[in-house]
Amino acid sequence: MPTINQLVRKGREPQKAKSKVPAMEQNPQKRGVCTRVYTTTPKKPNSALRKVAKIRLTNSREVISYIPGEGHNLQEHSVVLIRGGRVRDLPGVRYHVLRGVLDTQGVKDRKQSRSKYGAKRPK
């Protein structure tokens, strides 16, 4: 523990906050290419086949990203835009794919919360 004198001379160093989405490098979105598209199962009490993609970003980092919504058209070599935001029941998944941008199509027949899934307004 420092003495009062040491604190007067040096002071306390403020703690740096660690980023929850380090691969984004302070950007709101990042572009990347799918290297693998697959399904995975969530942690205990939940049960499902969650759609995820391994993505090589423009800063040459590899991240696992969740594909939201029902059905998708992604495959290997698809170019996607990702945003931060983890999926609580999938360990290691800290990013989301943006729907309706670049090679990702919006969710078909989506009526509510359309902007989050890149769906156009139904006629």
From Swiss-Prot:
PROSITE patterns on file: RIBOSOMAL_S12
MF terms (GO), sorted A to Z: rRNA binding; structural constituent of ribosome; tRNA binding
Coiled coil stretches, renumbered: none
Modified residue annotations for 3-methylthioaspartic acid: 89
Any single GO CC term annotated in Swiss-Prot or TrEMBL for this entry: small ribosomal subunit
Domain of life: Bacteria
GO BP: translation
Region (Disordered): 1-29
Annotated keywords: Methylation, Ribonucleoprotein, Ribosomal protein, RNA-binding, rRNA-binding, tRNA-binding
Entry-linked Pfam families: Ribosom_S12_S23 (PF00164)
Function, as annotated: With S4 and S5 plays an important role in translational accuracy. Interacts with and stabilizes bases of the 16S rRNA that are involved in tRNA selection in the A site and with the mRNA backbone. Located at the interface of the 30S and 50S subunits, it traverses the body of the 30S subunit contacting proteins on the other side and probably holding the rRNA structure together. The combined cluster of proteins S8, S12 and S17 appears to hold together the shoulder and platform of the 30S subunit.
Subunit (UniProt): Part of the 30S ribosomal subunit. Contacts proteins S8 and S17. May interact with IF1 in the 30S initiation complex.
Entries under NCBIfam families matching the protein: rpsL_bact (TIGR00981)
Similarity comment: family membership: Belongs to the universal ribosomal protein uS12 family.
Alphabetical list of HAMAP family matching this protein: Ribosomal_uS12_B
Name by which UniProt lists this protein: Small ribosomal subunit protein uS12
Species of the source: Novosphingobium aromaticivorans (strain ATCC 700278 / DSM 12444 / CCUG 56034 / CIP 105152 / NBRC 16084 / F199)
Lineage of the organism: Bacteria, Pseudomonadati, Pseudomonadota, Alphaproteobacteria, Sphingomonadales
Name of the encoding gene: rpsL
